[in-house]
Structures are given as structure tokens and as C-alpha cells.
């Protein structure tokens, strides 16, 4: 079995992160990560920049596209998404259609972004 270092929850300056996507990719490569998930809040705008930065620099780093989506039920990580789905038409009290939409949009893994930041009903929105 081969061990691959992966960082699966990262924000860049495309949302509330401190590093640009280029700097984030450089940092992950320097720390010998094999996989970097870019999961900015409610946007996939940094994915193309990150792919380009990784390619141009020749990093041995795979980019896993994703997004951290803010919902009434909390912050949800959706890995594998290349585009942010339009969730504005969904009933905020019904999570099942939301998760079905993520599957249809290409999410391969979905999870709670901050499992220990419990609020009401499960979490409450943005906290930064």
C-alpha cells in the first residue's frame, strides 16, 4: 500500500483564505503533498488558476476540485465538484434535494466541513 499525503479542506484568496491558489499549490508541493483539494467557500473560481499553477511549476501534485457550500444546515464539503451548483432554488429546510443535486453535479465525497462547530439546527452559516 502506498501512502499519499493529502490535504482535503483548503481555502484560497478566492474566498476567505490567506494564500493565493498559486501560493497554496507551492506550499502543498513544498510540504510533499500528493493531493490538494481546493474547497473555497461557495466558489470554484480558483480551480483553473490552481491547475495552471501546478502545471506551469511542474509540481507532482494532483488537484482535487471541490467547494465548501454554506447552507442552513452548515458548511458542507463537496469534493469532486468542478462547478458550484445553483442551490438558490432549493428548500433550505430539506437537505435531501441538496445532496441529490451535489451527486448529480459530480460530487464524489460529501461531508461536514466543521463537525465540532455545532449550532442550531446543525450549524449556522458563515463565522469568519
Predicted regions and their residues:
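A metal-dependent hydrolase metal-coordination microenvironment
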Residues: 1-109, 113, 119-128
Amino acid at each position: 500500500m502506498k501512502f499519499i499525503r493529502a490535504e482535503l479542506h483548503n481555502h484560497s484568496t478566492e474566498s476567505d483564505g490567506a494564500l493565493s491558489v498559486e501560493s497554496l499549490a507551492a506550499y502543498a508541493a513544498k510540504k510533499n503533498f500528493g493531493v490538494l483539494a481546493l474547497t473555497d467557500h461557495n466558489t470554484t473560481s480558483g480551480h483553473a488558476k490552481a491547475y495552471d499553477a501546478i502545471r506551469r511549476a511542474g509540481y507532482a501534485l494532483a488537484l482535487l476540485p471541490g467547494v465548501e457550500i454554506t447552507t442552513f444546515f452548515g458548511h458542507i464539503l463537496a469534493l469532486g465538484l468542478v462547478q458550484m451548483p445553483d442551490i438558490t432554488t432549493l428548500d433550505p429546510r430539506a437537505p435531501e434535494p441538496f445532496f441529490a443535486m451535489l451527486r448529480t453535479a459530480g460530487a464524489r465525497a460529501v461531508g461536514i466541513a466543521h463537525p465540532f462547530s455545532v449550532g442550531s439546527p446543525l450549524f449556522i452559516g458563515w463565522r469568519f
